[in-house]
A protein has these predicted regions:
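Active-site loop-to-helix "anion-binding N-cap" substructures in soluble metabolic enzymes
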Residues: 1-224
């Protein structure tokens, strides 16, 4: 983390790290005097105290000094997080003044049945229900079938789906300034192609971010 903060490329890009809960406190402390920001990978859908052994609340995350939170990741959805549960988490996180990175995306079955837009519409409508404004919301488009598989949609497919997301947000919140990231098997080999998509604002990087050299290579190729 410190090496990245000292990189000459740091000034040209914004970095948000979302480590496991057990490392949140350490990351917050190590990045305190840098411009690197820290986020959590999830939170519980109830914010108060109660019989929720093993869970962590948005309030607890905020108290650590964390500023961001990923919600709706496909792996959490596969563990049982419905759009309704994700919506509760979003509303709680926004109340705690956390900046939400909401993940949306279709499965391989959805793609084969050409239901990508329908899926995105349902996820966005349900997950953002009762949200009054899009402030502190970032959308990450992550096709479920692409995560960790090495398979990546074509640039045209990503552009089309990101365009839909941006138009949806613009219509819902009367604001076109929404940040949309792409996530799904992003690595140093395909970043040169992916960065050509002119309507995405950044990347949600998974496995490749765990290796310093690979990650810096991605950053270099994104900026140059």
């Amino acid at each position: 983390v410190i090496n990245i903060s000292r990189s000459k490329f740091f000034k040209k890009a914004k970095f948000i790290y979302c480590p496991p809960f057990t490392l949140l406190d350490q990351f917050v402390k190590k990045t305190r005097n840098t411009k690197i920001e820290v986020g959590a990978q999830d939170c519980h859908f109830v914010n108060g105290s109660g019989p929720y052994t093993g869970m962590i609340s948005a309030n607890q995350i905020k108290k650590l000094g964390t500023k961001y939170i990923i919600l709706g990741h496909s792996e959490k959805r596969s563990d049982g997080d419905t759009n309704q549960i994700i919506n509760k988490k979003i509303l709680i996180s926004i109340k705690e003044k956390l900046k939400v990175i909401l993940c949306v995306g279709e499965t391989l079955k959805d793609k084969k049945n050409k239901k990508e837009i329908n899926v995105l519409k349902t996820q966005l409508n349900s997950c953002l229900k009762n949200l009054k404004q899009k402030k502190n919301i970032i959308i990450a488009y992550e096709p479920v079938w692409s995560i960790g598989t090495g398979r990546v949609p074509s640039n045209a497919e990503i552009y089309k789906n990101v365009k839909y997301i941006k138009n949806f947000i613009k219509k819902k919140f009367k604001n076109k300034n929404i940040v949309v990231l792409y996530g799904g098997s992003v690595n140093q080999k395909n970043i040169g192609i992916l960065k050509k998509i002119n309507n995405i604002d950044g990347f949600l990087i998974g496995g490749a971010s765990q290796n310093y050299n690979k990650f810096i290579d991605i950053v270099k190729k994104t900026i140059i």
